[in-house]
Amino acid sequence: MDNARLNSFLEYPILGSGDSGTCSARVYSSDHGITTFQSCAVSANSCGGDDRFLGGRGVQITSPHHHHHHHHHPQPATYQTSGNLGVSYSHSSCGPSYGAQNFSAPYGPYGLNQEADVSGGYPPCAPAVYSGNLSSPMVQHHHHHQGYAGGTVGSPQYIHHSYGQEHQSLALATYNNSLSPLHASHQEACRSPASETSSPAQTFDWMKVKRNPPKTGKVGEYGYVGQPNAVRTNFTTKQLTELEKEFHFNKYLTRARSEIAASLQLNETQVKIWFQNRRMKQKKREKEGLLPMSPATPPGSDEKTEESSEKSSSSPSAPSPASSTSDTLTTSH
């Protein structure tokens, strides 16, 4: 039993059969708010469309036509509503003395065990006995007996005795409101488990491979670890000191390049590049004013000095005159 049918109300149209009127029950859901349904009215064993039953909240309608009145013995009729309805019921077969009869129950989402305010001076149309709590009704239809079996509290019964023709089938219709997609999805979500355990994510071998691994530089020719093409010499303090001494006396290589390279454990290219960079740094500092201007040298003298140093390195070194005189002095002594 779903809770959507807790708030339901009953319609009791009058069906004429002989001299006695009978009531048939229809169960309507209260989710529609104000709804009008057509029912039959008693007029000389014929059904007409003069009587209407309107179920809603505080809405009353009465039938403008009144037919002849059949007297019945007043019998107590009580029932308990399980909804929040303000129902006005008026039937033409009960005559002028049977006016609008208000069934007022307090509005609430689960307003159970609420007895209807039925005036004893108005005779009912047929003997009807309601017992128990009408919650989640299950309709069972027979030709002579209609029963409501409560789902949660006890088993209440609505017993109806029909009079007259036995072949007349009393309509006991249950108005089932088709749920909207929103309600249907909500019910499916309620029926489904609250949370499903998700399987842990699998780690494959291809996911472990890094797309951009760090590049491992090879050890260069001069001990520099980096890109193979980028050759950069890291000079030691001793090498830098000796190179600065040579540069202080002469900004260009005067001694044999191979001799300087051999004494510093460097090659000739490294020494040449260092002197070139050192001269560029010297000129930059002079332009910035950090160092005094060095005596200007002719522009071609630099190249001539470099060329002469290269030639001297290629030819065997001849003894200088000072060294020769010193040698002669030592031999004479």
From Swiss-Prot:
What's one Pfam family here?
Homeodomain
Question: Residue ranges under compositional bias (Low complexity)?
Answer: 311-333
Protein name from the UniProt record = Homeobox protein Hox-A1
Organism of origin is Rattus norvegicus (Rat)
Instruction: Report the family membership.
Output: Belongs to the Antp homeobox family. Labial subfamily.
What residues are annotated to bind DNA?
227-286
Where does the protein principally reside? nucleus
- Does the keyword Transcription feature in the UniProt annotation? yes
GO BP, one annotated term: outer ear morphogenesis
Q: Per the Swiss-Prot or TrEMBL record, what residue ranges does the short sequence motif Antp-type hexapeptide cover?
A: 203-208
Its Gene Ontology cellular component terms are: nucleus
